[in-house]
């Protein structure tokens, strides 16, 4: 089976979140299921610089204000189609936001262009590649099935994956014609969404099947509280919606081979984690205290991620004699609050505002516990990496965190299956209770090490998710 995957980022070439990890890891996992994936991504500077053996396979004379071409290329393990459109993608900043922190004003055209290219490829516009199935990811690719629907050409079945329902790609209605959509599309059963054009809504409306990245999140987004205005449509789609857990790239995330660690280890050599703990403390300016319970945070610094709750709970961390190491970037108010916390608690709280791949691995390999107090979490990869590395995840009772962490309640402790701590409600009080439970377990080395071994024994790879995606693909192509 040949699959065309369309998305706006792919690890390791360009990444702002979990979408890139999935786009980067799922194709290799699907190859074990006999499925060949080619991924279409925008030609950002970081992407075009990484290409090997790029060949122009389709020229587009005018694509939203300029000439473009689709190039077939390899980049590491990835088999790519790259939409080379310098007038849309050759810019500084990240894929969606300029260096001043403001969204690019032409994001509608930039990602409609990606969708146009995806629709062309889906219809077999490039000789030698006719996909059996289209897999579009998030709002940036949401118009692909819409274009195919309104253009009326024969097309392969489409799977549309929602990685985060909060990012919906809403744009003003006056752009309808400029985006190449007919007036008939501007209806409730089309692309119209709250008086504008909804890219994500279009994907949900026209895909043959919808997936999201955990079973729990699939349930949550069909409710009024979790649906963010789209719950009615999701309930209407009913059995077309599937929750398939994300996996983790276990070749990249492997404590036994990880070159970012000060000391590599496996489940039989957990004592080596102490070397990494000292390295985290030294790197981040924390007191070199081997006994202190070290909490790590590797996250986007945003309200969704509950970072403000961690700041509110700092007095509890003080009372526990714990340390906190934070790595991430995000909302300016949260960044400022973290800087204040660091200044008020030297040697006990540390934060590096930014992102360093090597440090993210070191924190997973050296922290005793990883905090993930999200207000909502479609799947989450941080807790998967934490368990892989024997760092106990402390997570809120939402989304994929529920599906991937086994709470250390008395039954799970007695059965010897606990892998982390879940807390609720998602509040400062709920998190504080989770912190105290974590400290109590940390004070019992036998229970703690058993939890670490349980966590590291979990299969968090892409093997099972790939099987589930393959089964869904086959169910659609066999109709």
Curated annotation (Swiss-Prot):
Gene3D superfamilies per record = Glycogen Phosphorylase B (3.40.50.2000)
Binding-site residues, ADP-alpha-D-glucose? 15
So which domain of life are we looking at? Bacteria
Question: What is the uppermost EC class here?
Answer: transferase
Query: Its Gene Ontology molecular function terms?
Result: alpha-1,4-glucan glucosyltransferase (ADP-glucose donor) activity; alpha-1,4-glucan glucosyltransferase (UDP-glucose donor) activity
Q: Which family is it part of?
A: Belongs to the glycosyltransferase 1 family. Bacterial/plant glycogen synthase subfamily.
Listed name of the protein: Glycogen synthase
Q: Which gene encodes it?
A: glgA
């Amino acid at each position: 089976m040949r699959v065309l995957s369309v998305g706006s980022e792919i690890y390791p070439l360009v990444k702002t979140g979990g979408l890139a990890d999935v786009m980067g890891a799922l194709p290799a996992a699907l190859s074990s299921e006999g499925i060949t994936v080619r991924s279409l991504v925008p030609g950002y500077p970081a992407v075009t610089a990484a290409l090997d053996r790029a060949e122009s396979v389709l020229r587009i004379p005018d694509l939203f204000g300029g000439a473009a071409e689709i190039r077939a290329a390899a980049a590491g393990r990835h088999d790519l189609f790259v939409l080379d459109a310098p007038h849309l993608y050759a810019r500084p900043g990240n894929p969606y936001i300029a260096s001043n922190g403001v969204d690019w004003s032409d994001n509608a055209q930039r990602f409609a262009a990606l969708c146009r290219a995806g629709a062309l490829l889906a219809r077999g516009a490039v000789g030698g590649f006719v996909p059996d199935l289209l897999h579009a990811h998030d709002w940036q690719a949401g118009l692909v099935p819409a274009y195919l629907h309104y253009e009326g050409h024969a097309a392969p079945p489409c799977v549309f994956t929602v990685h985060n329902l909060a990012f919906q790609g809403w744009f003003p209605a006056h752009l309808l014609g400029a985006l190449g959509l007919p007036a008939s599309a501007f209806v409730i059963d089309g692309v119209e969404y709250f008086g504008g054009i909804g890219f994500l809504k279009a994907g949900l409306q026209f895909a043959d099947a919808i997936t999201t990245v955990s079973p729990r999140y699939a349930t949550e987004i069909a409710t009024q509280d979790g649906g963010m205005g789209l719950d009615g449509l999701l309930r209407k789609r009913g059995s077309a919606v599937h929750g398939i857990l994300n996996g983790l790239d276990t070749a990249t995330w492997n404590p036994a081979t990880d070159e970012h660690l000060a000391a590599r280890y496996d489940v039989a050599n957990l004592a080596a984690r102490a070397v990494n703990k000292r390295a985290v403390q030294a790197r981040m300016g924390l007191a070199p205290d081997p006994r202190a319970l070290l909490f790590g945070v590797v996250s986007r610094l945003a309200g969704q991620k509950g970072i403000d709750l961690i700041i509110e709970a700092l007095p509890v961390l003080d009372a526990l004699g714990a340390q906190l190491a934070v790595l991430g970037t995000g909302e300016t108010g949260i960044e400022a609050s973290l800087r204040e916390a660091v200044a008020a608690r030297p040697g006990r709280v540390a934060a590096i505002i930014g992102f360093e791949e090597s440090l993210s691995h070191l924190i997973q390999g050296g922290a005793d516990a990883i905090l993930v107090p999200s207000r909502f979490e479609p799947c989450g990869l941080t807790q998967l990496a934490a368990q892989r590395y024997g760092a106990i995840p402390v997570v809120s009772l939402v989304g994929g965190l529920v599906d991937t962490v086994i709470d250390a309640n008395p039954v799970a402790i007695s059965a010897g299956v606990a892998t982390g701590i879940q807390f609720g409600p998602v509040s400062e009080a709920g998190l504080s209770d989770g912190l105290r439970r974590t400290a109590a377990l940390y004070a019992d080395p036998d229970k703690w090490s058993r939890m670490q071994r349980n966590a590291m024994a979990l299969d968090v790879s892409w093997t099972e998710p790939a099987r589930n995606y393959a089964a869904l693909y086959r169910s659609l192509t066999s109709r």
